[in-house]
Curated annotation (Swiss-Prot):
Family to which this protein belongs: Belongs to the PsbU family.
Signal peptide: 1-28
Membrane topology, record value: Peripheral membrane protein
Name of the protein this chain belongs to: Photosystem II extrinsic protein U
Gene Ontology biological-process annotations: photosynthesis; photosystem II stabilization
Gene name of this polypeptide: psbU
Length: 123
């Protein structure tokens, strides 16, 4: 009986040590937002997914024109932003001059859920 107990203890130690010295490699996980950053979303302002603070670098956009853009999303193509109702001629000129800084991707629930694109809570 003692021999059986010793064999069982030794076997348990061997199995345990094999698992200890042979760790599993970490699995790389890529979430939806990381995947979107590999597209134009990471380099340009996405009209369907960006929040209002990303328009601060564009002269004349923050906060009024940027909020109009966000409230009228989603867009199918970048040029659709020129068709926002109620834009002044000056706002249309600013949009036209900066069309190359925008992109349009599919709306992602991870980025627009909670309707916080106007106030994302970043202070």
């Amino acid at each position: 009986m003692k021999t059986l107990a010793r064999i069982l203890v030794v076997f348990t130690l061997i199995v345990g040590l094999i698992g200890f010295f042979n760790p599993l490699p970490a699995q790389a996980a890529l979430n939806a937002v990381d995947a979107k950053l590999t597209t134009e979303f990471g380099q340009k302002i996405d009209l369907n997914n960006s929040h209002i603070r990303e328009f601060r670098d564009l002269r004349g956009f923050y906060p009024n024109l940027a909020s109009k853009i966000i409230k009228n999303a989603p867009y199918d193509k970048v040029e659709d932003v020129l068709n926002i109702p109620g834009l002044s001629e000056r706002q249309q000129e600013r949009l036209q001059a900066n069309l190359d800084k925008f992109t349009v991707t599919e709306p992602s629930k991870e980025l627009i859920e909670g309707d916080d694109r106007i106030n994302p809570g970043v202070y």
